[in-house]
Amino acid sequence: MIVVKIVIFGLMALLVSVGMLTPSYAHTTVEVEQYKIEAGWGIEPPVVGIRNDVVFKITESGETEGTYRGITSAFQNLEATVMYGGASKNLDINSDPKPGYYFSSIIPTKTGSYLVDLQGEIRGVIVDIQIPVEDVESTS
């Protein structure tokens, strides 16, 4: 009888712990004055040689506490560059239909750590930041 109770308790604990698993998104959010800028990969984990997107979400506080409003035309005077080691590539930024969301297609060619460098301004606020994004993994 005790063995049955232990097995049932173990199964219940396993089910509860599996239910608590959530996907982890390795997006990084930084604040620049009133703006929140989030950067990461569209498909995670990023894998070398597989087409992906560098994605951005740029918001400011909404009218109600705890809400945020997407910033349109944020890249009008803002440039994004992806950097790996000593190499860099300017990104062609596309607007997503959802306000405040942007993306740039890229095929990562090397495993390891990448940075996104943002330079310019958003509505008069100077932006000069580097945001680390999730490491690119190998195909094996």
Stretches found by the model and what they are:
Residues 23-140:
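N-terminal soluble domains immediately following signal/targeting peptides that reside
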Residues 1-10:
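Bacterial N-terminal signal peptides that target proteins for export
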Residues 16-23:
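C-terminal segment of classical bacterial N-terminal signal peptides
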